Amino acid sequence: MKPSLIIVTFIVVFMAISCVAADDEQETWIEKRGDCLPHLKRCKENNDCCSKKCKRRGTNPEKRCR
């Protein structure tokens, strides 16, 4: 009975670690994709933009790409 309990515990721990690793991988992929969305391309904090043409829009201090 105890060996089967150890095996089940090992499987559950392995699955939990796999799920956490998959979430980290997905976040890394999203970061690599970039900060710019296709429909609303935002400038980065250092004013570097996907289209390299940043301009202020309206009274909002946040800059956006055009």
From Swiss-Prot:
Stretches for region Essential for stimulation of [3H]ryanodine binding to RYR1: 55-57
One Pfam family from the record: Toxin_27
Cellular compartment(s): Secreted
Cellular component, GO, one term: extracellular region
GO molecular function (one): toxin activity
Disulfide bonds: C36-C50, C43-C54, C49-C65
Positions bearing the site annotation: Essential for stimulation of [3H]ryanodine binding to RYR1: R64, R66
Highest taxon in the source lineage: Eukaryota
Chief localisation class: secreted
Cleaved propeptide residues: 23-31
UniProt keyword Signal present: yes
Tissue occurrence: Expressed by the venom gland.
Keywords: Calcium channel impairing toxin, Cleavage on pair of basic residues, Disulfide bond, Ion channel impairing toxin, Knottin, Neurotoxin, Ryanodine-sensitive calcium-release channel impairing toxin, Secreted, Signal, Toxin
SUPFAM superfamilies, sorted: omega toxin-like (SSF57059)
Residues of the signal peptide: 1-22
Notes concerning its domains: The presence of a 'disulfide through disulfide knot' structurally defines this protein as a knottin.
Function: This toxin stabilizes ryanodine receptor 1 (RyR1) opening in a long-lasting subconductance state (35% of the full conductance state). Furthermore, it triggers calcium release from sarcoplasmic vesicles (2 nM are enough to induce a sharp release, and 67% of the total calcium is released after toxin (100 nM) addition) probably by acting as a cell-penetrating peptide (CPP). In addition, it has been shown to dose-dependently stimulate ryanodine binding to RyR1 (EC(50)=0.3 nM).
Family: Belongs to the scorpion calcin family.
Annotated protein name in UniProt: Opicalcin-1
Upper classification of the organism: Eukaryota, Metazoa, Ecdysozoa, Arthropoda, Chelicerata
